[in-house]
Structures are given as C-alpha cells and as structure tokens.
Curated annotation (Swiss-Prot):
One of its GO terms (biological process) is ascospore-type prospore assembly. It comes from Candida albicans (strain SC5314 / ATCC MYA-2876). Its main location: membrane. Pfam families: Ras (PF00071). A lipid is attached at residues 209-210 (S-geranylgeranyl cysteine). This is Ras-related protein SEC4.
Length: 210
C-alpha cells in the first residue's frame, strides 16, 4: 500500500471519515499514527473536533481522506453530531482493555445511524490489541458484535501500528465499491455525501505514513 510521494498529482475523490467512540479509546492516537506515523503515549483529550488529511491510492484512484476526530465526552456530543452529516465512513472505536467502552458501542452505533447519512459505511475497530495483559474484550467478542451490527471489523493498535493503515484502506475500498454501484461512470464522478470530483492538484495532503 502506497500513499507517499505523489502529492503533486490530482486526486480523484474526497472521502470524509469520522472517528467516534468513548473518550480514551485511542481515536486521536489512531489518527496520528495513520497520518503522521507517530505515536503519543500521553492521553490528550480532543476538545470538540479536529481533523487531518492523508491521500492514498485505492483501486487505481487517488483518494483524499479527510478524517475527523471527535470528542468522546458527553458534553461535546451535541457539537460533534453536527459533523456526521456528509460523512461517507464512520470508524466506531472501542478499547479492548476497557469493557465499558465495548459495552457502549451499541449506543454509539445508534447515535451514528440517527445522525449520519443513510449510506454511510460503519467500520468497527477494537484498539490497543497490543496490550494482551490488560485485555478485557476478546477478539471473538468483537467479531460477534460486528456480525450483529452487520459491519466490518478489525482489531488494531496505534502503539504497534498493527492494522492501522488497513482500517482506512479497507473502509475506502468499501466506499468506492458502493459508489461504483451507484455511479456507473465510476467513483471519479461521485457527487454523493462527501464525494467530490476535482481537477486541481492537491499539494497539501499529508502522505508521510508507512
């Protein structure tokens, strides 16, 4: 998978993605690892909402991923739900070392389905899978919940960089396939929720990840 060194080329599509889940599950860490290939062990609470950009290649297309990192605290819930509109993909994250964050997944799923576009693709992620000593949620439990919710699932680790790229590449691929089905002309002309056909060069995208 290559998303490096070609930022001067035009991109074919923009995808707005949203990271949601309880506070402390590692949303910001996953995003930092994906975009900048860095890991910050310090817990820094997201205030409201933030976003980062990375451009990847998927199915022969240049996809500009605009990834929004939302606050997990209840007091920011009203603010962040406004950003669900237009999101083409939602990454719903829990912490495998925190059973409560896993128990809250279905509440988050309900919030997503209530506020996001009907065709938004949800992707379930169990973060911090490197910490087997403190694991409280098994991989099988995650798989069972994903099957119940009918969504794709991966365990990942921002710390060890396990499956971090895979989350976003797989989600982008699923969204592309949806748009191919909806737009016979291909994803380059997609104008649905968050999809933008552009002709100008994109020099600001961050591609410096492994």
């Amino acid at each position: 998978m290559s998303g490096k060194g070609t930022s001067s080329r035009a991109y074919d599509m923009i995808m707005k993605l949203l990271l949601v889940g309880d506070s402390g599950v590692g949303k910001s860490c996953l995003l930092l690892r994906f975009v900048e290939d860095k890991f910050n062990p310090s817990f820094i609470t997201t205030i409201g909402i933030d976003f980062k950009i990375r451009t990847i290649e998927s199915k022969g297309k240049r996809i500009k991923l605009q990834v929004w990192d939302t606050a997990g605290q209840e007091r920011f819930r009203t603010i962040t739900t406004a950003y669900y509109r237009g999101a083409m993909g939602i990454v719903l994250i829990y912490d495998v070392t925190d059973s409560r964050s896993f128990e809250n997944v279905e509440n988050w799923f309900q919030t997503v389905t209530q506020h996001a576009n009907e065709d938004a693709q949800i992707f379930l992620v169990g973060n911090k899978c490197d910490d087997e000593v403190n694991r409280q949620v098994s991989k099988e439990q995650g798989q069972e919940l994903a099957a119940k919710l009918n969504v794709p699932f991966l365990e990942a680790s921002a710390k060890s960089n396990e499956n971090v790229d895979s989350i976003f590449y797989e989600l982008a691929s699923i969204i592309q396939e949806k748009h191919v089905e909806e737009n016979i002309g291909g994803v380059g002309g997609a104008s649905g929720a968050g999809g933008i056909d552009v002709s100008q060069n994109n020099s600001g995208a961050k591609n410096n990840c492994c």
